[in-house]
Regions:
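N-terminal subdomain of lithium-sensitive/metallo-dependent phosphomonoesterases centered on the IMPase/IPPase/PAP
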Residues: 1-108
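General alpha-helical segment detector with a strong preference for membrane-spanning helices
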Residues: 69, 116-118, 149
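Hydrophobic alpha-helical membrane-insertion segments
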Residues: 74, 118-121, 154
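Short, glycine/acidic-enriched loop or turn micro-motifs at the edges of active sites
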Residues: 91, 112-115, 148
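Short glycine/proline-enriched turns and hinge-like loops at secondary-structure junctions
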Residues: 97-100, 118-122
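Amphipathic alpha-helical segments in well-structured domains
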Residues: 104, 122-125
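Asp-based phosphoryl-transfer active-site loop
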Residues: 105-118
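Acidic beta-strand-loop-alpha-helix segment within the catalytic core
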Residues: 124, 128-190
Length: 190
């Protein structure tokens, strides 16, 4: 994906804190990766087999899984901050741990929906990544819907749903009591 677009997104998301901006930009880029693979009718090819008992019922690692994970890894490496990545595909990967500071834990499912993607069912495709501090306290999390291209995210300020177009958030809704009432949903908080 384009480094220029990624940097532009970081600039546009910079009103949010640095980690959340990075999280949003990474998931937006993952949505681009999935769209590009889907549009070209590629990405469903098996590139690896999972070894061992983990997900023995689903041993295939598809290109869409690998490409989105590689995108996350690339951006975390470029960020230059110590990170311990816990990923569905790669397991535990230490990134920039030679740099000073306590590492962040980053947990991701680079692409959820591989079986559906492989069979051409364009629904329930997601990419998610969450950031935690060195004591595993949550910082922020983003879940991107690869079909609708919406990103749901949560941080210390609450939970939100954002529409991303290009390098910008064009619409953002706080998922609070007012939102639930507008959707006709019961209040679940006190």
């Amino acid at each position: 994906m384009s480094d220029k677009l990624f940097k532009k997104r970081l600039e546009n998301f910079s009103a949010k804190d640095e980690i959340l901006a990075y999280n949003l930009a990474m998931v937006a880029e993952a949505l681009d990766t999935v769209k590009e693979l889907s549009d070209k009718n590629i990405g469903w090819e098996e590139v690896e087999k999972r070894l061992g008992e983990y997900k023995s019922w689903d041993p295939d690692i598809l290109r869409v899984d690998k490409d989105t994970e590689n995108g996350y890894r690339k951006r975390l490496e470029q960020w230059g901050i110590p990170v311990i990545l816990l990923s569905e595909e790669a397991g535990r990967v230490e990134i920039n741990t030679d740099k000073p500071g306590e590492p962040f834990y980053v947990v991701c499912d680079p692409f959820d929906g591989s079986y559906l993607f492989k069979h051409g069912v364009r629904d329930f495709w997601y990419s998610s990544i969450a950031f935690y501090d060195s004591h595993f306290n949550p910082i922020c999390c983003c879940v991107g819907d690869c079909v609708s291209r919406k990103i749901a995210y949560a941080c210390k300020n609450g939970a939100y749903l954002a529409d991303i177009e290009g390098e910008k958030i064009v619409r953002e809704v706080k998922l609070d009591k007012k939102y639930r009432q507008s959707m006709g949903r019961p209040d679940v908080t006190e």
